[in-house]
């Protein structure tokens, strides 16, 4: 069963690196990462914080955004986030995790 919201998200890791992923529940996914049960990459770089997120109506769109983002250089990743924020795209959760 598909949910109505699909998210491409970017985490800031303790070492300053960025991690990009897909989820349909940002709050739960961020908790999973910080509990050390998320991606292997983030387990070694805890704690992580939500740096950026975009909401899409389909899983496919969110995963395409993630795929595109992962191919960018670090400089272009930051530029992508800055441009999207200027456009008002950045998803902000109701509470801090």
Swiss-Prot record:
Matches recorded under PROSITE patterns: GIY_YIG (PS50164)
Domain GIY-YIG, first and last residues per copy: 4-79
PANTHER family (UniProt xref): UPF0213 PROTEIN YHBQ
Family: Belongs to the UPF0213 family.
Domain of life (superkingdom): Bacteria
Organism: Bacillus licheniformis (strain ATCC 14580 / DSM 13 / JCM 2505 / CCUG 7422 / NBRC 12200 / NCIMB 9375 / NCTC 10341 / NRRL NRS-1264 / Gibson 46)
Family matches, as SUPFAM superfamilies: GIY-YIG endonuclease (SSF82771)
Gene3D superfamilies: GIY-YIG endonuclease
One Pfam family matching this protein: GIY-YIG
Name of protein: UPF0213 protein BLi00048/BL00536
């Amino acid at each position: 069963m598909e949910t109505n919201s699909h998210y491409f998200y970017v985490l800031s890791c303790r070492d300053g690196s960025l991690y990009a992923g897909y989820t349909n529940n940002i709050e739960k996914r961020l908790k999973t990462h910080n509990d050390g049960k998320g991606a292997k990459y983030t387990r070694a770089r805890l704690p992580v914080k939500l740096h950026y997120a975009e909401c899409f109506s389909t899983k496919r769109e969110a995963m395409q955004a993630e795929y595109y983002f992962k191919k960018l250089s670090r400089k272009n990743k930051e530029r992508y986030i800055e441009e999207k924020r200027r456009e008002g795209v950045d998803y902000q959760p109701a509470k801090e995790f």
